[in-house]
From Swiss-Prot:
Its main location: cytoplasm. This is Homoserine kinase. It is an enzyme of class 2 (transferase). GO terms for biological process: threonine biosynthetic process. It comes from the Bacteria. It catalyses: L-homoserine + ATP = O-phospho-L-homoserine + ADP + H(+). Disulfide bonds: none annotated. The keyword Ion transport does not apply. Its EC number is 2.7.1.39.
Amino acid sequence: MFTVKVPATSANLGPGFDTLGLALQLYLELKVTIIPQSTRIRFFVDGEEYPEEIFGDNLVYQAMKKVFAEAAVVEAPGLELTINSSIPPGKGLGSSAAAIVAGLYAANEILEKRFTQEDLISWAVEMEGHADNVVPAVAGGLTTAMLYRGNVYYQQFTFPPELKLVVAVPDIQISTDESRQLLPKKIDFMDMVNNLQRASYLLASLIKHDFRYLPAAMDDVIFQPRRKQLIPGFDRVFSQALGNGAVGVALSGSGSSIIAFCQQEEKRVAEAMQDAFAASGIQSQLMILAADPDGVKVLR
């Protein structure tokens, strides 16, 4: 028996669309028990057993099947799979990436680590469609990733430990596909230049622990202005977070969660963000987290 533990992730961080990502201390755990002399798979989610006709669509299961197929395994061993996840789905916190990574790493563990981390990341990006959540889920910390000629390349950095992360999770569920439909087919040249400047400055500022201009560096001019129409109270939440002490704020992934970076006053910032959502008639949950430095772990 072993457990695969995968962190939630926050992608983009403002201007770093499909590029920047951050692992969070909020987890999906997949417990795997191998059943000798059996080929049956039993699947449990939060204590409830799923019938086969339902769990076949689960991303954990699909990811495991992907690895077994790549290894030319005709018949997988009997397994009992138990998922417990604290990552809310459809909230821009990398729930699908966590599920995919958990399944890939679980199957690879069963196969005695036959495949490399590069293999697993490549398949995860293939399944997810982009690297910004997958890479920090695997590597931990703050990451920047690129796809080039079919390959995934990334760098990982230590996120400043003095920054706490306030995540406001409104009672609004947004699919990534729905959110991406709002994105422009063409981008204004100067908007592209502005976002490129800000993403570069943001990454350098976090590496140097210089937070003076994070509000400017995280001010995305292309994607958040379009996606915010799905989130009532968006502008007020941003302004209240910054006005109460946050050093930076961004939409987390495709939303609906909003993440604020805080050196101090994180409880005050959290309450201000929740009050701002409430003023628009939206209930929200709050989490005060730290960055996860390690990424996926296999625990025995």
